[in-house]
């Protein structure tokens, strides 16, 4: 694969390992950017991944957050096209073998910065009742707490016309997407989401899929400034 796929890591080694396995199964050897993890299990996992050459592991001396790959020095050395993701996704079992090339084609078709996986919140699995923090208002800040379905439903409201793919105009932060630098025009969230066989499940939303134990989640949320989950 000539398109590098970056996976961001911070005290969530069990998810990183799961993500690497999914990518390896698709003949992809990803690059892991670790945000100075302190969790012993995560460090052991990263050491094993390095030793077995399942991925390239780059360890940062500081926690740069979920957007570590977009810090100046990192982003500047990335090629014109690359992939980036948080590790906590369950890929679609019917994901096309050429999904990277198809997503790149979607970027070209819509001339958007990124094209990634849609994240359905209605599935065969029960949805968590935990809430997320929503920050609104640029002049006068306002915060409210919403359920996953309340937050995510808006990302399915703007279908786009395409000959064979189900696509929605919707922002993407750091869940899986292919990026095309030449289409960046100042909006980091400029994106489309591809559904159907490209849909992935965000595992922490579904208790039956969530891989983190309470202890592991505590380690993950400690010092994690990127998460919108209420820390309970």
Q: Where are these predicted regions, by residue range?
A:
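Short, acidic, metal-binding catalytic loop of nucleotide-sugar glycosyltransferases
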Residues: 21-30
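A conserved acidic beta->alpha catalytic loop
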Residues: 33-45
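A conserved hydrophobic helix/loop-capping motif in glycosyltransferases and polysaccharide synthases
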Residues: 3-15, 19, 33
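A glycosyltransferase accessory/donor-loop signature
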Residues: 168, 174-232
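Conserved catalytic core of nucleotide-sugar-dependent glycosyltransferases
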Residues: 65-68, 74-75, 90-190
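Preference for well-ordered, secondary-structure-rich cores of eukaryotic proteins
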Residues: 9-12, 35-36, 67, 91
């Amino acid at each position: 694969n000539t398109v590098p796929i970056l996976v961001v890591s911070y005290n969530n080694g069990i998810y990183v390992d799961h993500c690497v396995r999914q990518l390896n199964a698709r003949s992809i050897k990803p690059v892991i950017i670790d945000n100075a993890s302190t969790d012993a299990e995560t460090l052991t996992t990263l050491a094993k991944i390095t030793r077995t050459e399942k991925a390239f592991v780059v360890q940062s001396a500081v926690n740069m957050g979920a957007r570590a790959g977009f810090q100046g020095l990192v982003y500047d050395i990335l090629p014109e096209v690359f992939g980036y993701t948080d590790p906590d996704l369950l890929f679609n079992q019917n994901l096309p073998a050429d999904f990277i090339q198809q997503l790149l084609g979607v970027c070209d078709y819509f001339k958007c910065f990124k094209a990634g996986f849609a994240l359905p919140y209605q599935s065969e699995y029960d949805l968590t009742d935990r809430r997320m923090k929503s920050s609104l208002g640029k002049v006068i800040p306002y915060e409210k707490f919403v359920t996953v379905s309340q937050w995510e439903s808006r990302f399915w409201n703007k279908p786009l016309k395409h000959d064979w793919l189900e696509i929605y105009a919707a922002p993407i932060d750091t869940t899986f997407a292919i990026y095309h630098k030449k289409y960046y025009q100042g909006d980091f969230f400029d994106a489309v989401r591809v559904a159907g066989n490209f849909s992935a499940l965000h595992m922490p939303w579904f208790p039956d899929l969530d891989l983190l134990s309470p202890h592991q989640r505590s380690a993950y949320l400690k010092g994690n400034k990127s998460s919108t989950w209420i820390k309970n």
